[in-house]
Design a protein with these regions (language model features):
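ABC family nucleotide-binding domain
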Residues: 2, 8-216, 220-221, 225
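C-terminal boundary and immediately downstream tail of ABC-type ATPase nucleotide-binding domains
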Residues: 226-246
Length: 246
């Protein structure tokens, strides 16, 4: 279980302080596919960077199974990061490395032996449907295939949580459908909790069982996806869903 408690993030810039997250609280249950949706600049990407500890929250807590991740440092922080796989927007693949080498990269950083690395890479490429592209380079892949490599790499260390930043934003409708089906498969087969940051309503509706709407750094509405789509309570949710009052 992930508990976000009163999370805040303030950036200091030359022009002054920018509040990116404000008193954000939510509970994400084990096995959820949890959607975070909002307009551009709402705070979605900052939330993801705080969740995976690339940004230190200014205040509040991020609890993973009761452990406050925001309070960790050093070896404890590195260990906690292994529990969260991240798929960044734009894939972030190593262009001079093969598909297999990209997936193996985090395992080699953790000093797994070659046999263990090879076995895990083989397993993951089979899972994402790219067993026949192990020796290919990213430049030889389609957008959907690159996303599958990014997913396999994010799963390399057996994380409890998979964070996906706009995982379908650059994909055509058919490829989007196949990637979402893969995410469902990963969730069901591996029991991984998935958090999807997106601006695409169709993505949330088709795959997320629970969701939160974020606006100006605040969580303005959250709950069961079907209920929010059927009867949005906040002005922002109604606007996003095309149900604003006339």
């Amino acid at each position: 279980m992930i508990e976000i408690k009163n999370l805040g993030k303030v950036f200091t810039e030359k022009s002054g302080k920018v509040v990116a997250l404000r008193n954000a609280s939510a509970t994400i249950n084990d096995g959820d596919i949890f959607g975070v949706i909002g307009m551009s600049g709402a705070g979605k990407s900052t939330l993801l960077r705080c969740l995976c500890l690339l940004e230190k929250p200014s205040e509040g807590q991020i609890l993973l199974n009761g452990r406050d991740l925001a309070a960790l440092s050093g070896a404890d922080l590195r260990s906690a990061r292994r529990q969260m796989g991240v798929v960044f927007q734009g894939y972030n693949l190593l262009m001079q490395k093969t598909v297999a080498e990209n997936v193996a990269f985090p395992l080699k950083l953790d000093k797994y032996d070659k046999a263990a690395v090879d076995a895990r890479v083989k397993e993951l490429l089979e899972l994402v449907g790219l067993a026949d592209r192990a020796g290919s380079y990213p430049s030889q892949l389609s957008g959907g295939q690159k996303q599958r490599v990014a997913l396999a790499r994010a799963l390399a260390s057996n994380p409890q949580v998979l964070l996906c930043d706009e995982p379908t934003s650059a994909l055509d409708p058919l490829t989007t459908k196949s990637v979402l089906e893969l995410l469902k498969d990963i969730n069901q087969k591996l029991g991984v909790t998935i958090i999807i940051i997106t601006h695409e309503l169709a993505v949330v509706r088709s795959i997320c069982n629970r969701m939160v709407v974020i606006d100006n750094g605040r969580f303005v509405e959250q709950g069961e996806t079907a209920e929010i789509f059927e009867n949005p309570q906040s002005e922002v949710a109604r606007l996003l869903l095309g149900k604003e009052e006339v």
